[in-house]
Each structure stands twice: as C-alpha cells, then as structure tokens.
Amino acid sequence: MSHTLTKLDLPTLQTELENATAQQIITWAAQTFGPGLVMSTSFGIQAAVMLHLVTSIVPNIPVIWIDTGYLPLETYQFADQLTGRLQLNLKVYQSPLSPARMEALYGKLWQQKDVESLNRYDQIRKVEPMQRALKELEAIAWLTGLRRDQTRHRQNLKPVDLQGNQYKVLPILDWNSKMVYEYLTAHDLPYHPFFDQGYVSVGDWHSSRPLMAHDEDERDTRFHGLKQECGLHLPLSPEAGQSLDSSAL
C-alpha cells in the first residue's frame, strides 16, 4: 500500500513541538504518519538511546541501517547485540557498488583527503542507499537522533521539517551528553565499545578517531576534520538528486 505525504503546517508544528518531550514527539509522529514512519540508526556510540526510545513506543518500526562495508568489527557486533535485545525490525541497505569495485574505479577515496572525494564516497556508500531505503519502504517520515550540540549545521534544525520527499522528526534534538548518559544508565543500555577508547562519534573505520584536546566538537573526529556531515542529513540539491538516479552508482 502506498503511503501519501501529508501536508503539515510546519511553522505551527515546529513551535508546538519545540518544548515537547522526546516521548511526546515520537508518539505524535506515530499517530500522524502511521505505517509511513521509519527510523534510521548508525549503531554509533549512543545509538541505543534512540533505538530504545522509539521501539518502546513503536515496537515494529522499520529501522534503516546503511552498511557501508567499511564499518569496524565492533560496530557489526554491537548492531547484532542491540538487534537481538530490542527485537529490531532491521532493514539493512548497501550500495550496489561493492567496496572492491568502488576502489578499483575511484581508488581509496577517503585517502585522497579532499572534500570532493569524501563527498563522492558518502554519495556512493551512504546517500544513495538511504534514498533507496526511504523510497522502497514508502517512508513519509523519518525519525533520527540528531542533536543540536553535535555540529554547527545541526544547531539550526527544527524538531520536524521537510527534507526531500520525507518529513524528518528529531525527538532528542535538545538533549545533551549528560541526558544521553542518564537515559542509558536508567535503562541499563550499552554504549558502543569504542566509547571506552575515547570515541564520541564513530562511523567507518578509516574516517573515525578518538576525541582530542584540540577538537572543537565531536564531529571534528570524523572525515579527517574536513567535513562534519556525511550527507544523509543535508538537503539535496537538484544535482545531487539527479546523481542518485545515475546507473553509475
């Protein structure tokens, strides 16, 4: 059954939801979007918070995980642990271009250490699979765990907004690290294993490192400090949208 995009009064909703609790926002999203509601996870450092929060209210929600093929061993093990414990309805998506084929065609893009190469990498390994997942699952709205304290771009986000063809809903937008820690502790939920090694954010093995004293924020530990966003949470330009449909991917 096709899910129809509902036209919402975003300015009013953004004001109403600005002071709502995470649970209230998730409940609102479930009631508003019904089977058209999905969530995404990276199985990162604090992933258990959103997974527990959302599945406590919407138990069988489709959980999209983009497997880049370059995740650390510990991330795959952490994903398996949380999937079993929380009984996740996990939907795994990958690029149709295998890591070996991508490297043969473009080289090790992350080693080129320029933004253009990193953007191409993210487009192939993350953005295209996510857009395909949202389309195949007929998503109207997408729950994600972005927080304002993570990057400069995220400071200006709203609890609900339109990105491309889907609404994006951010229940823990105003949470800080202390609130995350308290939630994990209260519900006996695990951090990613790399937390104990000084990581505050983890993605692919080649583009993540522990937090250093000179880092201004946690996302400086990603992408060699050249960029803060992988592209999943940025508005698509017309050119980016067109490239997602390219058979070259």
UniProtKB/Swiss-Prot annotation:
CDD domains: PAPS_reductase. Belongs to the PAPS reductase family. CysH subfamily. One of its GO terms (biological process) is sulfate assimilation, phosphoadenylyl sulfate reduction by phosphoadenylyl-sulfate reductase (thioredoxin). It is found in: Cytoplasm. The keyword Membrane does not apply. It is an enzyme of class 1 (oxidoreductase). One of its GO terms (cellular component) is cytoplasm. It catalyses: [thioredoxin]-disulfide + sulfite + adenosine 3',5'-bisphosphate + 2 H(+) = [thioredoxin]-dithiol + 3'-phosphoadenylyl sulfate. HAMAP family: CysH. This is Phosphoadenosine 5'-phosphosulfate reductase. The keyword Cytoplasm applies. Pathway: Sulfur metabolism; hydrogen sulfide biosynthesis; sulfite from sulfate: step 3/3. GO terms for molecular function: phosphoadenylyl-sulfate reductase (thioredoxin) activity. It comes from Synechocystis sp. (strain ATCC 27184 / PCC 6803 / Kazusa).
